[in-house]
Each structure stands twice: as structure tokens, then as C-alpha cells.
Amino acid sequence: MISSLHRPTVATVDLQAIRDNIKAVQEHISSTTKTFAVVKANAYGHGAIQVAKAVDEEVDAFCVSNLDEALELRQAGIEKDILILGVILANEIPLAIEHSITITVASNEWLESAKACQKDLAQLHVHVKVDSGMGRIGVRSLEEANQLIAGLTKSGAHVDGIFTHFATADEENTDKFHQQLAFFTDLVNALAIKPELVHASNSATSLWHSDTIFNAVRLGIVIYGLNPSGKTLNLPYPLKPALSLSSRLVHIKKIKAGNTVGYGATYTAKTEEYVGTLPIGYADGWTRDMQGYSVIIDGHLCEIIGRVSMDQLTVRLPKAFDIGQEVTLIGQEGHQMISATDIAEKRGTINYEVLCLLSDRIPRHYIN
């Protein structure tokens, strides 16, 4: 998709904020801990290539979701280790080997299919995934893990790491977290062959359970300056949100009492009022459920009225602003602030989704 470079809606990404957030976490964990920066899903909407280049000196490796995301980084000149967190198809192994990309292996069945496609796994680097209770992918017993590591080693693959993922590290109730931690710890301690890298800590674990870190962490939402728990748990130290979203008024009019606005005529003016139009809509990731929420204009919270359209939305104005007046959708203006977490609360979702849904139509502008 082509970014709309000639439309005044833009996401500004502060790369120094991302670097500062990484350093903030690193200051609170052991200096010997390896840091993996998670840049999957286009770096949570921030731009994978630009973020990876900006933090290359601060981290030891990168995590992505799939082979295409890994290849994108390699083609952009990223040389550090890249771990694919998802499972790739066995016929994609040659590409992973060619580009020195580490893959996740999650089952003995996958290994059998891999050996059927690729007899020699001598140049393949892998991490073994353990399902300690997340319920998605991974081996679920010590027997499976030992069998898989032995089979991979016998086939010539380099088993560089073993890892798991916690389902509830960002919640107040820690029972499930400690169940998963105990399962994974016991399994790792009992392995016949123990890989060098052992990691279980995502952003939430690194923040609130730093005493449970093994020897590597996978930092995702935290490096972009957001709280993984939303508003459930307080951050143990400050983070800097890296992304702001702004637009400009492109049309302003005065409407009379009784006039309607938008699809379905869902908004009817009760009095004479000013209405402004912004060039952003649900095709940009500003979803229809944002009707009734606010944006910031000149320090004023201005309500979104009428339904959000594909490419435009309308807001009620306190006065007749000039065409081109800047509008803040995510970020701070004066004493007013709207965060991705605030928007997530309005939508009944999580801040991750708010950022990931910002489409490629919105150009990213990088500072610092």
C-alpha cells in the first residue's frame, strides 16, 4: 500500500524514545541478559526497518513473526540475529538458512516434515518452543522436548535456545504465571541437552517479574513506551510513548439545529455549531467505534460526531478554526493528552491493537 504522503495525516515516531525505553528496562535487569527487540507487525505499527536500524546498537537480536518480516530486515541491511517467533513451513527452511535466520521449532511432527523436505539441517539455527500454558504452539512435556532437541541435533541443526511465553504476566493475579514459570523451569533444569539461551520474559515479565528472568528477554510493547497491562498495573518506572498521530482540519462549516452529520444520520445538532472534517477514517485504522470519542484541537477536547467514514471523520468545534489547524489524535497538546491506552479503553481492546491497526496509508515521520 502506498502511504498517503500528500494527505495531512501523519504518525510521528520518536526513535530516541524507543532507545531510551530499551535502556530503562536494561537498567533494571542483569547486565549479562541478552536483549531481543520485538519488531514484528511492522514494529507494532512504528516501522520495522527504521526501528531496527535505530536500536541496532542497543540490542543483541531481533524477533519477528514470520519469514517475510525477517527477510525484510535482512534486505534492509540488518545483520544481527533474527528469531522468527512463529512456525514456518518446512519448505521454507532453505530461505532461512540462506539468510541466516533463526527459526522456532514447536513439535516433533514439524521436525519429521522438515527432514522429509531438507535432509541436511547442518546450517539451520533454531530455538525450541515450550507450551507451558499459553496453549498456542510448543512441546508440552519434558519427553517431547528431549526428543525434539535430540532429533534436531542428530539432524545437524544448531539448537541455540529454548523459550516459552507467559499468558498472564500483565495481570494482578499471578497464579497462572507462577504455574507456567514452575513448569518451564523444571523442564529446562531436567533437559538432557540444555541450549545456551533460555528465555521466557516478554515485556510484562521484564517489568513486573524481573526476578524470574533467565538469560534473555524479548522486549515488545515496552520499547514503544506503552504499558503491557493497559491500566491494570502501574509501571515500575517511566516509559516514553514513541508514537503520536496528528492530522489537520481540511473543511469547516457552521450547521443549524436539526442538521445531521455522517452515514446513517446518527448525529443531529441540537444548536447551531461548527463542524470540522479530518482526512482520517477506518481505512487508516481509526475505527468506527471512535464515534463519540475526542481529538485535541488548540488545547480543546473536540468530540467526534457522526459515524467515522472510510477516509474522513467529523468533529464538533468550539469555534471556527482556520483550515489547516493541527489536530492531535494520539499524543499530548498542552495539558491535554490522549494515549493509545486511552483509545484502547474506549474500544474495549488493548493498546497493542490500536497501534498495529494504524494502516500503511498513514506515513511515518521519524525524529531523533
UniProtKB/Swiss-Prot annotation:
Disulfide bonds: none
InterPro entries: Ala_racemase, Ala_racemase/Decarboxylase_C, Ala_racemase_C, Ala_racemase_N, Ala_racemase_pyridoxalP-BS, PLP-binding_barrel
Modified residues annotated as N6-(pyridoxal phosphate)lysine in this record: K40
Keyword entries, A-Z: Isomerase, Pyridoxal phosphate
One GO CC term, this protein: cytosol
Record keyword Isomerase present: yes
GO BP, sorted A to Z: D-alanine biosynthetic process; peptidoglycan biosynthetic process
Domain of life (superkingdom): Bacteria
Residues the entry annotates as binding substrate: R136, M310
Pathway, per record: Amino-acid biosynthesis; D-alanine biosynthesis; D-alanine from L-alanine: step 1/1
Active-site feature positions: K40 (proton acceptor), Y263 (proton acceptor)
Keyword Secreted found: no
Molecular function GO labels: alanine racemase activity; pyridoxal phosphate binding
Cofactor: pyridoxal 5'-phosphate
EC assignment: 5.1.1.1
Catalysed reaction equations from the record: L-alanine = D-alanine
HAMAP family for this protein: Ala_racemase
Free-text function comment from the UniProt entry: Catalyzes the interconversion of L-alanine and D-alanine. May also act on other amino acids.
Similarity annotation: Belongs to the alanine racemase family.
Protein name (record): Alanine racemase
Organism field: Streptococcus uberis (strain ATCC BAA-854 / 0140J)
Source species taxonomy: Bacteria, Bacillati, Bacillota, Bacilli, Lactobacillales
Gene: alr
